[in-house]
Amino acid sequence: MGNQLAEGARIAAATKGAELVISDDRCDAEGGREAAEHFVRENVRIVTGFLCPDALEAALPVLAAGNIAIVASGVSEPTLTERRAPAPMAVFRLATGLDKETQATGSFLGSLWRAQAFAVIDDGTIEGRERAARVLASLKEQQLQPVFTDTYRPGLDNQNALVARLRRAGATHVYVGGERDDIAAIGASAAALNHPLTIAGGSLLDAAPGAQPLSQGTLMIAPVRPQDLSTAKPAIDALHQAAKLADAYAIIGYASAEIAADAILRADEKKQPVLDTLRTGSFETVLGTIKFDDNGIRTDNPNRLQRFDGKRFVLADK
């Protein structure tokens, strides 16, 4: 993934006429610190990348001391260093994380399921519980009450007992805070028990297919794959021209470098710090228009309602 990120950044930098310095953070703390020290020696003005929290965590103090901003390509949640900092650090995130995903989920399902008997369930993990709790809270704020909530046992080949409980409760729709394989098993059990069930989940559905296929019509609230965005065409064309694979991380790397190059150019034109440009500017990228708030979080919400068509997830009409 790191190599793909670097390929995208390299091609974008060439397109923008920007100088690029690449260092491997090895996805660990030592690698992150060494990469940051290398960037300081090279007088880098903006660092992009970071797919691993440990590497970002270790790089932060070094880059902060050098007054170097970071456009983080893949770490969506604040690191411990950031959470402890008295003021927002110079980290600007392209990945939006659980907050925006569950906000979008609550909004979409609140509209779609207003007249439906729905359930909210989770797999008992910290992340699964967090997803379910946030979605449930959002739905309750909209005066919607589930007919059933439960924690199910994950990793089973079939979920007949769970689906039987959903059927007894009268639930025809269910949000699942859990993994793709579990959601596939729930769908298969619903079909086996002849219980019509609309199933929704989050970005955990965007994983490699397991032994059981997902049920057609399964809903996913998550960002659209970068390579499927209409705005991604320039990156896809440039990557193909360079005989490189136009996959998600290559396109994210391309967008990260676009933002960095544009921010530096504008800062020089306006004779202002790069950090100010990142905090106040709006950037046209292959991921769409990107603007950051005071905490370095994207102001837009890239999560969309998608429906499984039997082969892949496609945008769903509300």
Describe every region a protein language model picked out.
Residues 1-318:
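Extracytosolic ligand-binding ectodomains
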